[in-house]
């Protein structure tokens, strides 16, 4: 994901694009060459507005979303700017006689919604409408269909803009466009023009390997083609307006990808200045024309000379933007150094380590094997949204969850990978299985019949019980297993088993595991001998890959993906360089001075044997940190040193002794799982101290901990 990366190329071009927009409204070369001015203002400069749309889409639109907060914030901010701009330009509207028009109220509504109350303000309602359309299209139908729908809208707009002369001669189309023009003066608006650029911006952001060095040549070639085509359209006089061209799309696409090459320090000032300049250039255009020309008698210099006029407008606009930026900056309260995400306790998720583990496991598998990521229980406490939205871009396209509700959440996040539900789903929810295209595990013959009886087409995997004796068909149920292939509403897409003893290298356990493996492969022969296509085969266990790894199957990997073993004593046949992905941390919120003999916590479980410094951490067993680590059974790391847990761990807090650790203060970071200096506490170590396993420890976390993604 790229939303928080810094792209200085985009920041610099924002400023250039703002200057281009000023050029569109001031025609800087008109005094010297009408053709040159046309080329500059009607071929080169029009890339500016689509660039702004695409930039907004790049940082706003994503198929991976867990809510609409970013969209809401964007619309709220843009609406506020639009409202201020409308009020700011009322004097100019009065001067131009805007309020003397016929049908004033419906025209004001039309202008506010589509065209802007002053010509150049159309960009703001277009941004609001275009962002909303693009966001919901991508959310509901993914990029391919979203692009198709946005393209259709763009084509409709195209024939109401640059190609209007063609459709005007076709009576039915002319009627259609006349209806459109009763609602909006132009098709260059938030419905027809903006959505496709927002969609493309989001697609670029979500897509890996998007940079191409050949963009220099492509941009030059496309602009040459657009130059010829635009002059042709002008020559035949078929344009109603000149904002929308076919070649504008690939031109802005290549330009934007080129700008992504340039990384560096964020230029927040340039962003704000270019924004203010864009919205205020027309003010100074009017001021230069009216005030300077009439009061200072400089018409020949500031009005009749178009280039000087343009420079004056740009200069005045930039000065105003700098002043406004400085004023707003001085009035804006300074942000605290910490963020809300890390002000209490939090999990750090290292995405680089996650990708490393995926690559390591894939290399350990035979070439025909594939990886299915088990993301149940909030991806083993790592955050289901944070993890799954990272898996697809790095090439993991099979996911497994425990419940239907987990699967539905993934679909609502924007996940399009195959999702297998490992556990039971009530047959009464078959409609949801079908609607969200989830793959259901068939747990026995009776369940199979009930699911088919619901009347919804359901994709399913048959589970074979090879010794776990929980869910699944017996290896003796040949007829019942084969029956699944012939039911009307069940589409068998896979067969899998769950090895119950693959985590052990003891000879008797290895022998036990090998026996059901043979039975499982015997089951796989039944469909083949009956002339049926053998569906995908998968094995449910990380330890099956580590200790046996001899099949051409899909491996369901859970704990291995997250770089940990179940316990510190586990040994595996295959040694892999896996790296832990989650690190639990909390901030010191208070330091208490406890005199010798003083106590801390419930039941006075800790009594100080000396004058002590006790640090209070805002994390407890409600955050998933085990209560049986109380009273010195574990420790945390602060400043690279061990701080023992004292007293009983509470629901929301715990106390640690920092008497022997220098420079501990409020705000110091305590590491409960992770590395600090030369010291390290691993998840298996904490789990062992709590007399548990890593799976349980991690899956109990996340529910109210903030998750910070590090890449």
UniProtKB/Swiss-Prot annotation:
Top-rank lineage group of the source organism: Bacteria
Transmembrane portions of the chain: 15-35, 38-58, 79-99, 118-138, 147-167, 189-209, 242-262, 307-327
Catalytic residues of the enzyme: 376, 602
GO molecular function terms attached to this record: acyltransferase activity, transferring groups other than amino-acyl groups; alanine racemase activity; pyridoxal phosphate binding
Residue spans, topological domain Cytoplasmic: 1-14, 59-78, 139-146, 210-241, 328-711
One Pfam family this sequence matches: Ala_racemase_C
UniProt xrefs under InterPro entries: Acyl_transf_3_dom, Ala_racemase, Ala_racemase/Decarboxylase_C, Ala_racemase_C, Ala_racemase_N, Ala_racemase_pyridoxalP-BS, PLP-binding_barrel, Serine/alanine_racemase
Keyword Transport included in the entry's annotation: no
Enzyme Commission designation: 5.1.1.-
N6-(pyridoxal phosphate)lysine, modified sites: 376
Chief localisation class: membrane
Residues given in the record as substrate binding sites: 470, 651
Matching SUPFAM superfamilies: Alanine racemase C-terminal domain-like, PLP-binding barrel
Cellular component annotations (GO), alphabetically ordered: cytosol; plasma membrane
Subcellular location: Cell membrane
Region (Racemase): 336-711
Cofactor(s) listed: pyridoxal 5'-phosphate
Sequence similarity: In the N-terminal section; belongs to the acyltransferase 3 family.
Protein name: Amino-acid racemase
Organism of origin: Enterococcus faecalis
Organism ancestry: Bacteria, Bacillati, Bacillota, Bacilli, Lactobacillales
